[in-house]
Amino acid sequence: MPPERRYQIALCVLYTCFTLLRFRYRRAARAQIPVPREDNGDAQRLGVLIPYEVMTFFLYLLLPRTLAWAAVPVPAAVRWAGAALGCAALVLFAWVHRALGANYSWLLQLREGHTLVTSGPYRWVRHPMYTAFILLHMAAALLSANAFLGLTWLGGLALLLAGRVRREEAMLTEAFGTKYKAYMARTGRFLPGVGRAVNLAKARTHGSKKPSQG
């Protein structure tokens, strides 16, 4: 079997497992009380990003020569590290869904009786599901060793999350007030410990700007 075929199979297995996992929890979410669809542009952006990723994914699998011009030399160990990263992303997805329970929604909406989840991975990170998406996209970039696929997938995800995260945090701040602000102060947005480090840096900056007494 050609070495490239092994990477293609690994990527295919990862995204098949991801699709099955998401389908399971989305189906459960649809069975709950329906909510109005969001109207903030995310649906339109997803309507472009998802078909694009599916198209380039199958181009890489079935017609790899069409993307060969963007192939980059990546050591085998690094590419297989991408597979391990993808497995970690799948585990994180499952953990996130288990922590969210009935609070999960693929829409940027709060359901009736929505609670602030601070258990599981949410104990350290405010948006662990987005972290899992980032890890999965990084895994695809490493496994495919294709600059075009990796950069456009990660770039598209970054554009989507840039606005969505701000809106989500504003929505949760409005809903939970000081409780969510305190939660933000002790957690990172995508990585654990970053929030606290940022707050300490801000405190030191403000402290250094205080006028000296003489």
Please give the residue ranges for each predicted region.
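Histidine-centered phosphotransfer motif of kinases
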Residues: S119, R123-T131
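Membrane-anchoring alpha-helices and their flanking helix-loop junctions
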Residues: M1-T118, L136-G214
